Amino acid sequence: SGPFKVKEYKEGESITYERYDDYYRGKASLDQVIIKIMPDQSAQEAALQSGELSVMRVTSQTKLDKYKKDDNYTVYNIPEGRLNYLAFNYQSEIMKNEDARKAICLALNDDEIVEGAYGSEELAKPAKNFCSPENLYYNDEMKGYQQNIEEAKKLAKSSGLSGKTLHYIYFQQRPNMKETAQIVQQQLKKIDVNLEIEGMDGSAFFPHLFAAWI
């Protein structure tokens, strides 16, 4: 269904796609595309600078600013349509309480998360509903929660959330997730909620997130 098809997959190393000549919108201009699997961002940069890589995803404001100033590179802003979100575990007794969930939402500041974890809205934008702002079905009329610490404290106290310690897991291979978790941790401290944060690789994170909760 796309302009390329899988030619070779080397686990943990690379995926090679070759052109699919029968693509209904016509042949692609490239014969093949090789995607290198490089979890280490320093290795990515070294490969880009040596010419081993033609394209690299930039996930930090510092690197974005650096490459924008360097005439040897061209920076493209391509919306991913990806949505990063906080999911509540409804099997947890405290998370079954709607006021506890509201308290958490009211304690968070999306703008601070974007600024602290990404650097600016050049790399991420706050989403106020369950679609990214680039999605066709994004609803501008939905405003989401606005940070209100005093109201969050009241709800946290009345729901029994105050003084609790919550366990927060994140996918550690995905950029900016650790920084996001740390900012959320600091914001929840303002309403007397402690957060234990734990990064997991894919083999642990996804089974824990989906299979373990069902």
Identify the residue ranges that each predicted region occupies.
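Short, well-ordered beta-strand elements
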Residues: G2-K5, I15-T16, D31-I37, G163-Q172, ...
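Structural transition elements
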Residues: F4, A124-S158, R174-M177
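Ligand-binding "clamshell"
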Residues: D65-N77, A212-I214
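Periplasmic-binding protein-like
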Residues: T74-F88, Q91, M95-E134, E179
